[in-house]
Structure formats: C-alpha cells, structure tokens
C-alpha cells in the first residue's frame, strides 16, 4: 500500500510540475510583449492616437485615464502639446513575469527631446504594467507611471 501511495504522489508531482510549466510565460509571449512595448512607444511618438489606444484593452487604464476614447484623447493632446518637437520614448530594463493569459511588466523610460542640440533627456520614470492576452494579442490593461523627479524639483525645471 505504501508503494502505491508513493507512486501516486510521484505521478501527481510529475503531472503537477508539467501543468505548472505549461502555464508559464513562453518565449513567444515574451517576444510579443516586447513588441507591444515597442508599438506603444512608436505610436505615441508618431502621434498615431488610434494605434496608441490599440495597445490597451478596450477598458484599459493609463494613470487616471480609462477606456479607448480617453486614451485616444490623451494621445492627441500629447501630440498637440509637443508643438512640432521631436520627442522619443526610450525604454530599458524591461522585466516581464506571468503566465499564458496575464503578465506584469516593469520598465524604465527616458523621454528624450531631439529638437534640442544636443538632444536632452526631459524626464525619467518607470512604468508598472498589467497585461492580458486577448484574441488580438497582448494588450495593456493598466499602466501606471512613477516619476524619478520629485514634484518640487519638476516644478522648478526650466520650461522648454
């Protein structure tokens, strides 16, 4: 009887380990999520408000803005605020954890102004993200930012 129980635990352990391994974030999922981060940056930098909003779920949230229309409005406002300046989002140190259905991401951002000579770093911050896999692929369901610049310092920064 003890051999049967031991055998049963061994089989359950193997199957349980396989089930756990089967629902980890695959290399393909990692790649698709990295591409999502790239599409997000390119869309906001190029002023493509619809492409920007499409990186989110329909009810997606960016800081305090929620839903497709609010995200499109934000991207349009951002483009108008630039007033022709060339600014680019540069991400580094991307970390992704999760499984085949949802993931968490963390990444640093440098916002660089290329309309100045030499180019200048406008700000640095971090994104903390919740992502979900939809029928259309990976999308952000929630993105929050945290500035590296304390508000008192940011308020005193020279206007560009």
Where on the chain are the PLM-derived regions?
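A solvent-exposed, acidic/Ser-Thr-rich amphipathic alpha-helical stretch
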Residues: 49-111
């Amino acid at each position: 009887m003890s051999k049967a129980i031991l055998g049963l635990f061994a089989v359950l352990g193997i199957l349980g380990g396989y089930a756990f391994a089967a629902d980890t974030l695959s290399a393909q999922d990692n790649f698709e999520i990295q591409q999502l981060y790239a599409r997000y940056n390119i869309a906001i930098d190029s002023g493509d408000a619809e492409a920007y909003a499409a990186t989110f779920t329909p009810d997606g949230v960016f800081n305090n803005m929620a839903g497709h229309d609010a995200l499109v409005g934000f991207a349009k406002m951002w483009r108008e605020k630039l007033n022709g300046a060339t600014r680019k989002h540069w991400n580094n140190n991307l970390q992704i954890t999760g499984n085949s259905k949802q993931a968490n991401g963390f990444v640093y951002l440098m916002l660089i102004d290329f309309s100045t000579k030499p180019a200048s770093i406008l700000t640095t911050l971090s994104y903390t993200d919740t992502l979900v896999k939809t029928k259309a692929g990976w999308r952000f369901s929630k993105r929050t930012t945290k500035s590296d610049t304390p508000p008192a310092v940011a308020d005193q920064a020279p206007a560009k």
